[in-house]
Amino acid sequence: MGRGPSIEGRKNASDAKRGKMFTKIIREISVAARAGGGDPSNNPRLRTAMDKGLSANMSKDVIERAIKKSTGELEGVEYEEVRYEGYAPGGVAVIVDCLTDNRVRTVADVRHAFSKCGGNMGTEGSVAFMFKRLGVLSFAAGIDEDTLTDAAIEAGADDVVVYPEDGAIDVLTAPDAFAQVRDALAAAGLEPAHAEIVFRADNDIAVDGDTAVQVRKLLDMLEDLDDVQDVYSNVDQAALGA
């Protein structure tokens, strides 16, 4: 009878996944600091990236070094933001946000993923119109819905969405109101479990069978690329077993 993966094997896989996540967060911190300065109190994007790092148990020293490299206090690599759009099998729209120090490498990697999984890359704007850019502050079950809703609306949020299946709550904002709402809720003692600005599809597309398998394969392959920060799609996640 065969044996499952060893404890050491599982640990190595976990360490690799954690290392990849740290790399992505450090790149986001670097770009945010270079664009808006190294003071998170005056740079909402940097603060969001730092919060993400701290939530992932990244040390403050690692975060500080990333900031200093970006602001010129330490030598570091300069990354640029690039975005690619395309279609997965079944007409599923996909947006891929990247931070890279080599555009040629990145576009080749992204194009390879689309091609290998039966999709195709599109031109700029080819699918972005199917999505809205918005801030999402996510709260776990257990928080008082009325208190959160009142505070969020007063702070300038656009909507509050409650998920009855698990009791989680999302506070939705316009991108330019994201930092204001987050700070107001924090001041009221309401700290989200997760907060970021994302693309959210206007409508989801259902897929099944082999198409669902290929879509999942493409999304996983894109997310696993070192230069890719975020992958958004309009696939119905339930169809992928998510």
From Swiss-Prot:
GO molecular function, one term: DNA binding
Name of one Pfam family that matches: Transcrip_reg
Protein name from the UniProt record: Probable transcriptional regulatory protein XOO1659
GO cellular component, as recorded: cytosol
UniProt keywords, alphabetically: Cytoplasm, DNA-binding, Transcription, Transcription regulation
Keyword Oxidoreductase: no
Listed NCBIfam families: PRK00110.1, PRK12378.1, YebC/PmpR family DNA-binding transcriptional regulator
Family recorded in the similarity comment: Belongs to the TACO1 family.
Location in or out of the cell: Cytoplasm
Database matches in InterPro entries: Integrase-like_N, TACO1_YebC-like_2nd/3rd_dom, TACO1_YebC_N, Transcrip_reg_TACO1-like, Transcrip_reg_TACO1-like_dom3, YebC-like
A biological process term (GO) from this entry: regulation of DNA-templated transcription
Main location: cytoplasm
